[in-house]
Structure formats: structure tokens, C-alpha cells
Amino acid sequence: LPAYADGVRSGIRELGPHLIGQDPLLLGPLNRLMDKALRGHPYVKSPIDIACWDIKGKVAKLPVCELLGGRYGDDFVLYRAISQQDPAEMATNVQSYRDQGYRRFQLKVGGDPNVDIERIKQVAAQIQPGEKLIADANTGWLMHEAARVCRAVADVDVYIEQPCLTYEECL
């Protein structure tokens, strides 16, 4: 199943017959049933799981956040993605996003490791105290490239997100 909207619809058609008559309040057994009926494809199962949490909340007359342990706070901090461009342009964008109220910046990388190193360093130079920088490679690096980038930016306060295709490659 491809990981896009048609894939979700196909997956739900595949799962549907297995779910009819199941209790949506029993999430553990329901998730195990979905895993048995369709291996992988969490993007198909997630909307079903979310809908079941919504049903649980309505039955309990509680917001889902209370079912999950309580509200963490009154709001949460959003991040702003910075699209892949020339490193200097990406760094310049930080100030305009900061002016819009953002304090978390997700830098899109995952192309040429040499250019990505420059992207990370130039954008990091614009980050102020209290702000966060994430470099999201969207699985675009091979393992040796990810290791090289991480070594090159070891002195930079940056989270590296999804560097490689598989979990094992990221270890």
C-alpha cells in the first residue's frame, strides 16, 4: 500500500471487515487485531485509533487529553519549517519567522551532505537563546552521510530528525 491518501483508503477497506462488531473502547485488543490483519502501515491504523480515543472520550464525557493523563499546559509551541534553499537564504528566513512568533525552527536537509552541513551551521548561527533548531533529513542520508553530518555539526545545538531510511541505520 502506498503511504498516501489512496493507500489509507485501501488499508481501511482491508481492515474494515476485521473491525466490524469490535468494541472501540477496548483499544489494546483492537490494535492487536489491526496489527494481525494488516502488518505495518501505521498511517492506516492511526486514524482508526484516534477515532476510538474520541469515542472513549465521548462515552466518558471527558476530553481525550484527560484520558491520556491530563493537560500538559494551556498551549504548545509550534515550529516553522524552513524549506531547502541556499544556506544563506535559509539563515535569512529565521528572522522573518521569528517576527511571526516562531521560536522552533525545522530546517529541511537531506540532500548533499556538504550543503546540509552549511545549512545547519548558517541557520544555527541565527538561533537565539531559548530557541530550538531541528534538522530534518526526511530519511535522505545514507548511514555514512548521516554520521559525517553529525560529526561536522557536533558543536551545534541541533536535533537531527529522520536522518536515514530505517531505524537500524539510525543507531
Label the predicted regions:
Residues P42, D74-E89, V109-G110, N138-L142:
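Active-site mouth loops of central-metabolism enzymes
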Residues L25-L27, V64-L67, Y159-P163:
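Flexible, glycine/charged-enriched surface loops at secondary-structure junctions
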Residues Q85-Y97, H144-R148:
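Short, acidic/polar
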Residues S96-K108:
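Catalytic domains of carbohydrate-active enzymes, especially glycoside hydrolases
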Residues L1-V59:
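Metal- or metallocofactor-binding catalytic centers and their adjacent structured scaffolds
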